[in-house]
């Protein structure tokens, strides 16, 4: 199947082009297009993500260097000019790429789901990361008086270790207001940092027969209804409580659980609120610990978007670039699963970054490459991102 094909072409063969074309037709993406199609555009952006291009100009230089290989890489027959890619990113509907990203996330989640904790039900972490932008160049992304930025809000499947949902807003949008964008599923655990203690939304989770685990703010006002006297090591408090603030009590009128946990490794105390009364206090603490997986995802996302210049300055172009980054991330996760690779994701990404235009079978590439040869490409990623 992959004989005499470039590594990049073998990789993109895992993409569902039929499904992508459905979104292209839905939004008229290829209307009046003669050469550089939406498919070519997405692959060009993915090539830039995987090869760590620093700017649009840097990406075009790479295409010029591989001009003879361009068609077989899936990038079309015509030379790709800087203005061609910039215009496509500015004018083509970002929803084509966003909806394909949702499709890729669903496929990756379904394939990669495992039970990393002995707790039934899906487990998600929800958080955001801010990507700073120059206000003079991106005036639509105003954050503060002299700053600009966008936020990527992500619902992250901590068992499949891929995003399950995301949305992009300006950085001025408060995190807790995005809770209403989540479609809550029954018998599912949602893990939040303390920026998300909107009791109205937490009660909504409770009423859908799902569960939340959220860090409590230090100024929380509550009364203890009942507490446990015997607790395991490092559990300092395990109590049933009710809110006492007038507005808070109206937003969450029932009692819930408060767990105070001491982390020996960091010498810190954490206070969690949850409606999961069926779990042990240690299970609650261990669930919250899995939040670090979404932080690793944000490190990857920021590294691949932390470039000298975005490949377009409009909101549409920025949304396309973020969507393509997530598509690329999910593609690597799917390839890793389907090929049953024993490599860590860190190794897979690094090997791909220096091998995209090689004619080596993917299996041979990952089986035979000595990772010591690519250690000089070291970055802040922690090995085992999907493992």
Regions found by a protein language model. Give the residues of each.
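Juxtamembrane membrane-interface segments at transmembrane alpha-helix termini
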Residues: 70-73, 358
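Catalytic micro-motifs at enzyme active sites that drive phosphoryl/nucleotidyl and oxygen chemistry
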Residues: 73, 112-113, 140-143, 201
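Short alpha-helical linear motifs
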Residues: 82-85, 108-111, 369-375
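Single, function-defining residue in the core of a domain
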Residues: 1-58, 62, 92, 99-103, ...
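A short, well-structured juxtamembrane/interface segment
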Residues: 106-113, 176
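Major-groove recognition helix of helix-turn-helix-like DNA-binding domains
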Residues: 72-94
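A short glycine/small-residue-enriched secondary-structure motif
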Residues: 58-68, 75-82
């Amino acid at each position: 199947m992959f004989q005499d094909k470039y590594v990049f072409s073998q990789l993109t063969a895992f993409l569902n082009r039929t499904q992508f074309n459905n979104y292209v037709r839905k939004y008229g993406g290829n209307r009046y297009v003669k050469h550089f199609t939406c498919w070519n555009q997405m692959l060009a952006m993915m090539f830039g993500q995987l090869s760590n291009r620093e700017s649009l100009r840097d990406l075009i230089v790479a295409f010029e260097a591989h001009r003879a290989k361009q068609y077989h890489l899936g990038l079309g027959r015509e030379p790709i000019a800087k203005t061609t890619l910039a215009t496509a990113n500015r004018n083509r509907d970002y929803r084509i790429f966003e909806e394909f990203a949702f499709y890729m996330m669903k496929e990756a989640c379904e394939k990669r789901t495992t039970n990393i904790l002995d707790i039934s039900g899906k487990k998600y972490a929800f958080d955001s990361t801010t990507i700073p932008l120059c206000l003079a160049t991106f005036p639509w992304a105003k954050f503060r008086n002299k700053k600009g930025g966008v936020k990527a809000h992500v619902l992250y499947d901590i068992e499949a270790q891929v995003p399950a949902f995301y949305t992009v807003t300006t950085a001025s949008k408060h995190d807790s207001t995005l809770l209403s964008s989540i479609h809550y599923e029954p018998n599912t655990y949602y893990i939040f940092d303390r920026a998300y203690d909107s009791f109205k939304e937490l009660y909504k989770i409770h009423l859908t027969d799902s569960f939340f685990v959220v860090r409590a703010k230090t100024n929380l006002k509550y009364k203890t209804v009942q507490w446990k006297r015997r607790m395991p090591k490092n559990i300092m408090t395990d109590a049933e409580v009710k809110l006492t603030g007038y507005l808070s009590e109206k937003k969450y009128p029932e009692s819930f659980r408060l767990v105070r946990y001491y982390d020996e490794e960091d010498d810190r105390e954490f206070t969690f609120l949850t409606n999961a009364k069926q779990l042990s206090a240690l299970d609650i603490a261990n669930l919250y610990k899995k939040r670090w997986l979404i932080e690793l995802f944000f490190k990857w996302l920021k590294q691949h978007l932390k470039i000298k210049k975005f490949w377009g300055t409009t909101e549409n172009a920025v949304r396309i670039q973020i969507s393509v980054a997530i598509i690329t991330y999910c593609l690597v996760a799917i390839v890793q699963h389907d090929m049953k690779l024993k490599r860590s994701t860190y190794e897979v990404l690094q090997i791909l970054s220096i091998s995209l235009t090689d004619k080596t079978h993917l299996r041979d590439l990952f089986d035979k490459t000595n990772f010591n040869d690519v250690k000089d490409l070291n970055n802040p990623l922690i090995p085992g991102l999907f493992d």
